Amino acid sequence: MGERAAVGYAMNLYVQSFDAQAGAVLKMREFDHPAIAQWLERAAQVNPSSSYSLMLASRVFAEMASDANSRVFLDLVHRHFTARPNERWVWLSHAIFVARHFLQDPELARHYSRSLRELTDPAQVPRWARQMEVFLLVEQNQAQAAQLLVAAMLQSGQIADQQELELLTQRLSEGRSQGDRRSQEKTLTSR
């Protein structure tokens, strides 16, 4: 391990142990999140071959911070993902999960999922990760947009496997059925 890698890991370990200072245990929500984000940023710059900072940002701090601070950590992950997408897609996929389920921000989740789909090499990233955008569109009752996206992915060669196409087609069909049921329920409740 080189000197830069050792310094990067030491910085990450310092940040990771930030909740135990001089014998006092702090609650994560009480942390100085902007300072932690700066430490993680510096550690990622010092040791760019490590994803440890991105793991801490997406798995630890983004899940525990307030919404505004969580977005700072997720943006850090997204920025570093764009530099090495095929190596860092795992952390962006978790950022998508946090944006969707912790922040309840489907637009941010779709933004990240679009980056994941557009910037990664299909040969190096699992299909499920590259399909997240389609699933998010279906979940948001945007089946037509999801259908157009699947057609574009098919035309561009991003979908080459028949089973993958069948899975996406089935998911689109389920999404349309759910959307139809929701529309009927709204109509009935508005009467």
Regions found by a protein language model. Give the residues of each.
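N-terminal alpha-helical interaction modules that lie
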Residues: 1-47, 149-151, 155-156, 169-191
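Flexible helix-coil transition and linker loops at the boundaries of alpha-helical arrays
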Residues: 3-7, 25, 41-47, 78-88, ...
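Hydrophobic/aromatic side-chain positions at a characteristic register within alpha-helices
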Residues: 28, 62-65, 100-101, 135-139, ...
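Soluble non-cytosolic domains of exported or imported proteins
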Residues: 30-34, 48, 64, 68, ...
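Alpha-helical repeat scaffolds
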Residues: 40, 69-82, 105-120, 142-156, ...
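Alpha-helical adaptor scaffolds
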Residues: 54-132
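TPR/TPR-like alpha-solenoid repeats
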Residues: 60, 98, 136, 171-175
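Elongated scaffolding segments in large macromolecular assemblies
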Residues: 123-154, 162-166
